[in-house]
Amino acid sequence: MIKDVLDYFKTICSIPHPSGHEELLGNYIEEFAQNHELDYARNEIGDIIIYKEASPGYDDHAPILLQGHMDMVAEKDVDSNHDFFTDPLEIYEEDGYLHATKTTLGADDGVAVAIMLALLSDNSFKHPRLECLFTVQEETTMDGITHVDKDWIHARKMISLDGDVVGETNVSSAGGVQLTIRKNATFVESHDQGYKFYVKGLLGGHSGDAIKEERGNAIKIAGLVLKACLDNGFDIRFSSLNAGQKANAICRDGLFTFQSTSNKEELKAFIHERMEEQKALYPLEPLDYTLEEEQSGHVILDSDALIHFLALCPYGVEKYSYYFNHFPVLSLNLGIMETTEKAVEIILLLRSENEINLKLLVNEVETLASLFGLSVTPTDEYYGWSYDPDSQLRKSYKEAYKKAYNKELKEVPTQGGLETGYVSRIFPDMDIVTMGPNCIDIHTPQERLEIKTLYEVHDFLKNWLGEL
């Protein structure tokens, strides 16, 4: 039985493949190449490239690089028992969309893997030589694309399948850097009234694509509310702060525990008022909170510094494009906050198409952190992909799209960090376009794939390759 592109995607959903743990999916792809007698290579980190020779009559056509990443963001609802390392995703179809039960679906970027496998297994269409690159760890460190052997790739035309809107092609992507803000924690014994402040219900989303929606962030909201408490004379001393799971996902919920000597009813009423104000700022999100009393035996010394930093730290879109209406070119996401026995850490992800703007924003955060005695460690810096106004591949894509659908292909930049940034740095002469089906609310448990658009992208690409 011949598998179609949706069959391949469903198979991918049955194989655990969170970022950094793509081995099982990589094994499946390697076995696929062997079964189809296709040349391939796999490196130590887990990247795979599979080659499909040109169709008869296409030997003199320039080769094409198709690319996508194997890993997925592993996010789930708080009441989910799903284990991303061992369990297959529980998928279901509803109203033309494919969903996963209480977890991310991994359409970002499992659809790319599915499309490439479907094309590699299909001998019914005309095409140049195909180089299909499957990378790992895109959602976390980008280590996969940085470890790709340059000698693997001969093509100078690249089609990235990491897009998530039909009829759109990215024309640039942001570079970025992750900052870890650290406060060494000295815990002191205290037996004042304890509280558990849980901020929840926010939509979250990808900190590249959804940041322009100006969605609420649980870490930022908690910081603003608790800073207001301090400003109005309430006693707030943190015991622990834990929020978010991924640096590149807008924080949907967080638990902030603290002690206070302030009047219980007055404190609760004040926090309620401040949270009602926050709800009014995000009318399209089901923002909610709980504030429960608890008994705890310790607090973090000088935790005011953390509250002030959270309230004052830049967040969201810092700068919009001059050329593309309402598209961010500089942003910052508060992704994770974690308390250990030794420290409290806040992980930020900064994105910018422009290296100068990125350095200025990093300096702003470093300066703010230093005022409150916090250290800053930059890691996981990655490169942007600059707009090429003379792209011949994009010109061909636009013409083919107009011919197929009688409408214009939309060109958009993205604040998302794409592997195209590394590819364009390694191969400055690489001509790059992106495409993909409609993937909605990626990086959240509400993620869903519009099934008909998966077929649409697959079929369009299959036909377009015959024209290249």
What residue ranges belong to the model's regions?
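Zn-dependent metallopeptidase/amidohydrolase metal-coordination segment
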Residues: 329-345, 349, 408-463
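Substrate-recognition/cap regions that form aromatic- and gly/pro-loop-enriched pockets
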Residues: 327-412
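Acidic/His- and Gly-rich active-site-bordering loop/insert found
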Residues: 3-97
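Active-site-adjacent substrate-binding region
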Residues: 217-220, 224-241, 387-430
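His/Asp/Glu-rich mid-to-C-terminal helical/loop segments that flank catalytic regions of hydrolases
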Residues: 215-232, 262-263, 305-309, 319, ...
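Active-site metal-coordination/substrate-binding segment of hydrolases
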Residues: 58-140, 145-156, 191-194, 314-321, ...
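Acidic, glycine-rich active-site loops and adjacent beta-strand->loop/helix elements
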Residues: 70-72, 104, 133-141, 162-166, ...
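Midchain, well-structured core segments that form catalytic/ion-binding scaffolds
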Residues: 16, 96-99, 139-140, 148-351
